[in-house]
Amino acid sequence: MSSQSYRERTLVSVIGDDDTVTGMLLAGTGQVNENGDKNFFIITQKTTDEQIAEAFDDYTTKRKDIAIVLINQFAAERIRDRIENHVQAFPAVLEIPSKDDPYDPEKDSILRRVRKIIGE
């Protein structure tokens, strides 16, 4: 990937519950591009794993303006295979806690990779 394409990645996207996404939008991360594509995806009780995976794939492979994907850890667990298979530097995928589900560092794929590298 050229350095020019890295410069085009300026957005943070979020996949999560209503409270997490609302907080990120209030922080100013929300964006809708000229095609009507949003950089956020709200998970409800009716959201399927396939819909979460589709949003993740959109943000990590199709969109070239996303630099960071924040995903609630409970959602990452639902698409763990895709999270584990994402090895590109950009966009970076970071698992974050939600209001109802505490963060478990043992489930975080990035921390597991770091521990493997440093030999823990």
Swiss-Prot record:
Location (main, coarse): membrane
InterPro entries given in the database record: ATPase_V1-cplx_f_g_su (IPR008218), ATPase_V1-cplx_fsu_euk (IPR005772), ATPase_V1_fsu_sf (IPR036906)
Family annotation (Gene3D superfamilies): ATPase, V1 complex, subunit F (3.40.50.10580)
Compartments reported by the entry: Vacuole membrane
GO MF annotations, alphabetized: ATP hydrolysis activity; proton-transporting ATPase activity, rotational mechanism
Any one of the GO BP annotations: proton transmembrane transport
UniProt keywords, alphabetically: Hydrogen ion transport, Ion transport, Membrane, Transport, Vacuole
One Pfam family named in its UniProt record: ATP-synt_F
Topology within the bilayer: Peripheral membrane protein
Gene Ontology cellular component terms for the protein in this record: cytosol; fungal-type vacuole membrane; membrane; nucleus; vacuolar proton-transporting V-type ATPase, V1 domain
Top-level lineage group: Eukaryota
General function of this protein: Subunit of the V1 complex of vacuolar(H+)-ATPase (V-ATPase), a multisubunit enzyme composed of a peripheral complex (V1) that hydrolyzes ATP and a membrane integral complex (V0) that translocates protons. V-ATPase is responsible for acidifying and maintaining the pH of intracellular compartments.
Stored NCBIfam families: V_ATP_synt_F
Subunit architecture: V-ATPase is a heteromultimeric enzyme composed of a peripheral catalytic V1 complex (components A to H) attached to an integral membrane V0 proton pore complex (components: a, c, c', c'', d, e, f and VOA1).
Family: Belongs to the V-ATPase F subunit family.
PANTHER family named in the record: V-TYPE PROTON ATPASE SUBUNIT F, VACUOLAR ATP SYNTHASE SUBUNIT F
UniProt protein name: V-type proton ATPase subunit F
Species assigned in the record: Schizosaccharomyces pombe (strain 972 / ATCC 24843)
